[in-house]
């Protein structure tokens, strides 16, 4: 089965395994988030959005995936390779609310990140251009 990832929104999960936010130096960004389980993920964030709209930051419109290479950003040295599992899902909507999510495919992924002080959003550390993610 083939999927056109360029037509699919891409999200990440912050804190998807215990201790990751601390290891990555990002725990301070989520200190005000409370969950029933202190080890639970803290947020969902956008990485890529294939919708052209003036209110969407330009970097979110850049398709980040490449199956052959990662292109490191210029003048950035603090990169962290993050092996992940990418999941393709069908999302069932009821008006403007998600009613259900059905996983339909998965693949190994390299969620390479820039550890960048001063970034206002985690998504700024995730999508810095074409070929910034492996799949």
Where are these regions (language model features)?
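Glycine-enriched loop-and-adjacent helix/strand subsegments that border the catalytic/binding cleft
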Residues: 5-135
């Amino acid at each position: 089965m083939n999927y056109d990832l360029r037509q699919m929104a891409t999200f990440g999960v912050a804190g998807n395994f215990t201790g990751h936010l601390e290891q990555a130096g990002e725990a301070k960004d989520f200190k005000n988030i409370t969950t029933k389980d202190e080890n639970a993920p803290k947020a969902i964030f956008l990485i890529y959005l294939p919708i052209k709209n003036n209110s969407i930051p330009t970097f979110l419109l850049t398709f980040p995936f490449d199956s052959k290479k990662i292109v490191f950003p210029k003048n950035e040295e603090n990169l962290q390779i993050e092996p992940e599992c990418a999941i393709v899902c069908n999302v069932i909507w009821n008006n403007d609310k998600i009613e259900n999510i059905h996983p339909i495919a998965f693949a190994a992924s390299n969620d390479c990140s820039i550890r960048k002080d001063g970034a206002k959003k985690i998504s700024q550390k995730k999508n810095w251009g074409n070929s910034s993610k492996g799949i």
